[in-house]
Amino acid sequence: MPSLHIFYGGTFDPVHVGHLAIARAAHAALQAPIALIPSADPPHRPTPGSSSMDRLRMLQLAVSKEPGLSADPRELRRAARQNRPSYTVDTLTEVRSELGPKTSIIWLLGADAFVNLSNWKDWQMLPELTHLVVANRPGITLQTQLPPKMATVFNHRWVQDPATLRKTPHGHLWLLNQHPNPSSASKVRAAISAAAHWEADLTPEVAQYIRTHGLYGIHDIN
């Protein structure tokens, strides 16, 4: 079977059970290992609520018992080395250089991130570097929420059979239909801030890390 390399990027601030559900579903559907890549402070979103090293450590804890999943710190290392923002297109250019022009590469992302892809640096270049696997998310309808300029670039690239992704190195999109999980990082952070119940959206290891390190203002909660 031709090799397939899957990368799942995100802020993971913090990593929650919804992220893990998407990664598990992709791993099961595509039968390939998945490297989860925490982003550096993203240029197109507000600064994360925890440090990059906290986010990496939480991600490592979350995937430590997940077969086929691993944490990849390359984007954090590159941002620290170059002292500038880190972009997905840079990460994929680096990965493509490492793996060569004929290797099948997938960038996994949620539908909520995909519909905002036109805010990303050089987003039109992504199909020349990778396939995109888009996981459905609650409240997102791709047919109606995709901006026209994105529809022009992507609509002819969708495939129905995921086996196509192994046969070509880049350029296709496939919809990962999984049971959408309503968890979100913003929901977790808001729940911590409001002293509401939040642990159920996280693995026990990540929840304990947040408590131990006082992230998201938890030590301010009485």
Swiss-Prot record:
It holds the Pfam family CTP_transf_like. One of its GO terms (biological process) is NAD biosynthetic process. Keywords: ATP-binding, NAD, Nucleotide-binding, Nucleotidyltransferase, Pyridine nucleotide biosynthesis, Transferase. It is an enzyme of class 2 (transferase). Its EC number is 2.7.7.18. GO terms for molecular function: ATP binding; nicotinate-nucleotide adenylyltransferase activity. Pathway: Cofactor biosynthesis; NAD(+) biosynthesis; deamido-NAD(+) from nicotinate D-ribonucleotide: step 1/1. The keyword Chaperone does not apply. It catalyses: nicotinate beta-D-ribonucleotide + ATP + H(+) = deamido-NAD(+) + diphosphate. It comes from the Bacteria. Catalyzes the reversible adenylation of nicotinate mononucleotide (NaMN) to nicotinic acid adenine dinucleotide (NaAD). PANTHER family: NICOTINATE-NUCLEOTIDE ADENYLYLTRANSFERASE-RELATED, PHOSPHOPANTETHEINE ADENYLYLTRANSFERASE. Belongs to the NadD family. This is Probable nicotinate-nucleotide adenylyltransferase.
